[in-house]
Amino acid sequence: MSDTVSLTFPDGSVRSFAAGATGRDVAESISKSLAKKAVAIALDGVVRDLADPVVDGKIEIVTRADPRALELIRHDTAHVLAEAVQEMWPGTQVTIGPVIENGFYYDFAKNEPFTPEDLPKIEKKMKEIIQRNQPFRKEVWSREKAREVFAAKGESYKVELIDAIPEDQDIKIYYQGDWFDPCRGPHMASTGQIGTAFKLMKVAGAYWRGDSNNPMLTRIYGTAFAEQEQLDNYLHILAEAEKRDHRKLGREMDLFHFQEEGPGVVFWHGKGWKMFQSLTAYMRRRLANTYQEVNAPQVLDKSLWETSGHWGWYQENMFAVKSAHAFTNPNDPEADQRVFALKPMNCPGHVQIFKHGLKSYRELPVRLAEFGLVHRYEASGALHGLMRVRGFTQDDAHVFCTEEQMAAECLRINDLILSVYEDFGFKEVVVKLSTRPEKRVGSDELWDRAESVMTEVLKAIEEQSGGRIKTGILPGEGAFYGPKFEYTLKDAIGREWQCGTTQVDFNLPERFGAFYIDQHSEKTQPVMIHRAICGSMERFLGILIENFAGHMPLWFAPLQVVVATITSEADDYGRDVAEQLRDAGLEVETDFRNEKINYKVREHSVGKVPVIMVCGKREAEERTVNIRRLGSQDQVSMTLDEAIASLVDEATPPDVKRKRAARKPA
């Protein structure tokens, strides 16, 4: 065994240290100030405790400013939460407390569940523990000792967790002062390094191990950041997100609802269905003259899904069906016992349409589009309004082309996707290329060619946008059947949503034996490109509702104008105004109720109606209207003709405006 350890630093320099030197020793050898800031080390990219002995490899000193420190901060905060709870409520059992996206949680076994009122008290105790600046210290125990100690403490859940640790793994115990817990680590040097930028968010129930047959525990969710400003920003975004929650706005705007008899499927109300149809009509216009719109069956025999591979790869997410007679009479030889499946994807159906009739290379590319209703099983706990459903409509398209046409088709698709997002106000978009995973179909040569083409396309996307569109690579994140582009857009409060995809598929055409006749009269397998812009149209509508906080652009609002009268003397004029607005193509309702105008304005503002036209006796005499915009206290008076012309222009979809502008002579 060598007496020295060789370490390579980020600047490329190499230094030797005595065997047994710790990460802290290395940090101190660089500077006292760095050692003070250090919270951990990374050896060959793996984060470890500062107190761990170093080994040969590449080393980095991790400080609180390092993005990798955030997980440590949250992990350590979870431990402090557990200590605080056991100090305040002796006898409470701690179970598990992992770091999750945007924070952490800890599950506790306690006779009386926690309440939201307990959280500020626990936070106060946590700050006391952090102020003590107790060092984190690691020990390795035998399995027998760990079981004995935690059993003696009455920690039955910890004993179960210890028993579940594989025999070849050490039982690590982390101390912070006198409190200790089994944990894989790593941790920072002391509780004081956590800081005070943390908050306990909510209390919830959770079954032990996620199994409803097990005891119910109390879960406390929290979050933590390196800086208070980061926490404040996060809490601000959460507050904004709550105001914008599409489920809440959907009720207020009377758009849709869900109910127990149809978990994960949408009951669209009149206004919501208008919005859905507006999105469909917009997308249909964008595809006109470029794609053939088709429609494939929703229910297909299991054998087709076996051929496509979905039955083997995706079965747990599929709905299988039989005739009701077959279900109730399983032994009836006369009953049709075949198993069918509701389609989870549109692609196999589109391959069947492509295969119907011989195709020549001269006919390629063939572009098939469908607003296809698909069904995918999601666990009930994962369902979330329009964002996560079991039945949804995909704005799906599949392009069948030659390898030589692939780059041009990907660029054409990209231009369409970015144009659609811009029409809906999304200007910040990131495009990432996901490359080959370890498990995949198709030869390396085929992947090489596809990835080479798509890498060039990615460069072209960034160059053509003048750098406005950010791009990146996701190594190994491609599907097993081909590389793909993922489009992520940023909404009004900075949240990111992955929506569009462009995916090359080497698998499905081969499975179904799809081919075209090439210029040499040979059968050749086409390249298949899957394309979605909205992805799920229901989810995209949810994103739009939250992005605009319900204040939809006039061209996309399901109800554009409410004509509200101040007095019954203006009702006839109000009817005339509404009729003229409808004749001009606007979506209009009237409100002639015997209520004060401020009450009417308030009610329609809650419903997020973009324009309220107020008509009184004077307006009727002068044939004018008072226009009040959603979110504004100001009223603008104009003639009815002026108002109609202005609103009709504003209510014209952006793609229609562009088309009209292109037709105008120069």
From Swiss-Prot:
PROSITE patterns: AA_TRNA_LIGASE_II, TGS
Statement: the UniProt record of this protein carries the keyword Cell cycle: no
Molecular function terms from GO: ATP binding; metal ion binding; threonine-tRNA ligase activity; tRNA binding
InterPro entries attached to this UniProt entry: aa-tRNA-synt_IIb, aa-tRNA-synth_II, aa-tRNA-synth_II/BPL/LPL, Anticodon-bd, Anticodon-bd_dom_sf, Beta-grasp_dom_sf, TGS, TGS-like
Domain TGS: 1-64
Subcellular location: Cytoplasm
Binding residue positions for Zn(2+): C347, H398, H530
Gene Ontology terms: biological process: threonyl-tRNA aminoacylation
Cofactor: Zn(2+)
SUPFAM superfamilies the record matches: Class II aaRS ABD-related, Class II aaRS and biotin synthetases, TGS-like, ThrRS/AlaRS common domain
GO cellular component, one term: cytosol
Entry EC no(s): 6.1.1.3
Record keyword RNA-binding present: yes
Disulfide bonds: none
Region of interest (Catalytic), residue spans: 245-553
Cofactor binding: number and manner: Binds 1 zinc ion per subunit.
Keywords carried by this UniProt record: Aminoacyl-tRNA synthetase, ATP-binding, Cytoplasm, Ligase, Metal-binding, Nucleotide-binding, Protein biosynthesis, RNA-binding, tRNA-binding, Zinc
Reaction equation(s) it catalyzes: tRNA(Thr) + L-threonine + ATP = L-threonyl-tRNA(Thr) + AMP + diphosphate + H(+)
PANTHER family: THREONINE--TRNA LIGASE, CHLOROPLASTIC_MITOCHONDRIAL 2, THREONINE-TRNA LIGASE
HAMAP family assigned: Thr_tRNA_synth (MF_00184)
Subunit description: Homodimer.
Family, similarity comment: Belongs to the class-II aminoacyl-tRNA synthetase family.
Primary role: Catalyzes the attachment of threonine to tRNA(Thr) in a two-step reaction: L-threonine is first activated by ATP to form Thr-AMP and then transferred to the acceptor end of tRNA(Thr). Also edits incorrectly charged L-seryl-tRNA(Thr).
Protein name, as recorded: Threonine--tRNA ligase
Gene: thrS
